[in-house]
């Protein structure tokens, strides 16, 4: 309710007096009514009284909206039970939320949250914890500490790309060959891996730059005309910058890309990156443009290629957090895989809305805790007897491949993007 209480859900019809007796008081509601204002004054100190006051009031208004959201919590701890971070340290969701809210610090960093939405998925009140983490990170001047970023050089390059001075290095709409109303955006992991060595995972067997090539193999085999919108045309979507709290950088990237897309004549934007897909679809204002993940696009456009594997194959599928829990795309990748004759799709213990996170969010917190989470996921893969672990996110592929590169003989299965897996069968069919 508006006074900080939470009403328990029930399918049973009840009298108002009965409902009143079932209200649960949120113990934190009366504890911290002014603490956020103090944080905002500290974080947003602007000596200019005029503009500064307006900015402060705007940010306080935004934060107050999230304060109301947080007060829906009545402390049932179901979010803690679902939180993957809590499996390996004391950094559960409620600690992160309450400590940052009340200016208390018990050593649990705000950046330990994976923003995987497992907590909201388990919450009976559907509290949007991820949005709170997003706005709190945005109030931290300078963004996350360098120790949280494993690829600092790459992130610095992407941040520099956001500046207006970098615009001239990108091809204009007038000079770019756009010959279709459907555009494909590769994302940073895929594109950069084709241009340079992305990371040490390239020393293994995975080619992170393969997904775009695979996607166009499928488009061509289906007879779909799709324009490649390269990273020499569009900038980074800004997903990592947004969730690292680098709001100013994200807004610059968004402004540039949005203007370019509006002028391009594209009415459908397709990408194989779950993070890019979620960002374009939810964080941009592309009102006249349909944003689709490649698996969605293939299904909607009648994917039916009569594919089959050379020999029977057992596979399992890992649901990316951004594609699954956050965008509700579960069946499309599975439908595509099941369409291949000779494939037996076996689900892991945790799948779909209960799927485990790959452990690294927004290129942050690549540490022993995230490694332990991937080991647990690999144990689930092994339990299925799968020859191949499939997923639909290049970041998930790279993080899992990073662990596989360690050479543990128990991890003798292959890791592939669904699009790459399908393209492999198309190439075999066409030989």
Name the predicted role of every residue range.
Residues 67-70, 90-234, 240-271, 277, ...:
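Iron-sulfur-cluster electron-transfer modules
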Residues 73-79, 83, 113-119, 123, ...:
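Short cysteine clusters
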Residues 317:
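Hydrophobic alpha-helical positions that pack around
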Residues 299-314:
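Acyltransferase donor/substrate-recognition loop-hinge adjacent to the catalytic core
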Residues 38-58:
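Selective detector of the "anchor" transmembrane alpha-helix that sits immediately C-terminal
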Residues 56-73:
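Transmembrane-cytosolic junction motif
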Residues 193-293, 322-338, 343-431:
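Cofactor-cradling patches in redox/metallo enzymes
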